[in-house]
């Protein structure tokens, strides 16, 4: 008697099609294309989990740079002054302070300027 793999194959294909739910066009209907797209989306997700950290750091640096240049200090001098004045605030917190509490950021900047001279 031969072994019929119909239910097993259907289950395996439904598993991949469930993962491809919401994709556009044949990528959510056709088994082969759906499987390829799911695997590709996993590679994109893996890559982008690494890249999101870079993107946020660039954003924080751009915000800090804009806030410091408004006061006449470049970003690199500001970071150098932070290290000299032994202020240990990370870039994320500095950018949040620069946006939401500009007076506090100005106080930090004046302290940094005093250590630069």
Curated annotation (Swiss-Prot):
<dbReference type="Pfam" id="PF00453">
    <property type="entry name" value="Ribosomal_L20"/>
</dbReference>
<keyword id="KW-0699">rRNA-binding</keyword>
<dbReference type="InterPro" id="IPR005813">
    <property type="entry name" value="Ribosomal_bL20"/>
</dbReference>
<dbReference type="GO" id="GO:0000027">
    <property type="term" value="P:ribosomal large subunit assembly"/>
</dbReference>
<keyword id="KW-0694">RNA-binding</keyword>
<keyword id="KW-0687">Ribonucleoprotein</keyword>
<keyword id="KW-0689">Ribosomal protein</keyword>
<dbReference type="InterPro" id="IPR049946">
    <property type="entry name" value="RIBOSOMAL_L20_CS"/>
</dbReference>
<comment type="similarity">
    <text>Belongs to the bacterial ribosomal protein bL20 family.</text>
</comment>
<dbReference type="GO" id="GO:1990904">
    <property type="term" value="C:ribonucleoprotein complex"/>
</dbReference>
<dbReference type="GO" id="GO:0005840">
    <property type="term" value="C:ribosome"/>
</dbReference>
<dbReference type="GO" id="GO:0006412">
    <property type="term" value="P:translation"/>
</dbReference>
<dbReference type="GO" id="GO:0019843">
    <property type="term" value="F:rRNA binding"/>
</dbReference>
<dbReference type="InterPro" id="IPR035566">
    <property type="entry name" value="Ribosomal_protein_bL20_C"/>
</dbReference>
<comment type="function">
    <text>Binds directly to 23S ribosomal RNA and is necessary for the in vitro assembly process of the 50S ribosomal subunit. It is not involved in the protein synthesizing functions of that subunit.</text>
</comment>
<protein>
    <recommendedName>
        <fullName>Large ribosomal subunit protein bL20</fullName>
    </recommendedName>
</protein>
<dbReference type="GO" id="GO:0003735">
    <property type="term" value="F:structural constituent of ribosome"/>
</dbReference>
């Amino acid at each position: 008697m031969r072994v019929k793999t119909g239910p097993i194959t259907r289950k395996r294909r439904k598993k991949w099609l469930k993962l491809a739910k919401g994709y556009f066009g044949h990528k959510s209907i056709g088994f082969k294309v759906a499987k390829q797209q799911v695997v590709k989306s996993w590679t994109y997700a893996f890559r982008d989990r690494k890249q999101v950290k870079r993107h946020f750091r660039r954003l924080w640096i751009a915000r800090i740079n804009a806030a410091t240049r408004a006061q006449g200090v470049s970003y690199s001098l500001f970071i150098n002054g932070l290290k000299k004045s032994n202020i240990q605030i990370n870039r994320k917190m500095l950018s949040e302070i620069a946006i939401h509490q500009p007076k506090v950021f100005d106080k930090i900047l004046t302290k940094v300027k005093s250590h630069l001279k």
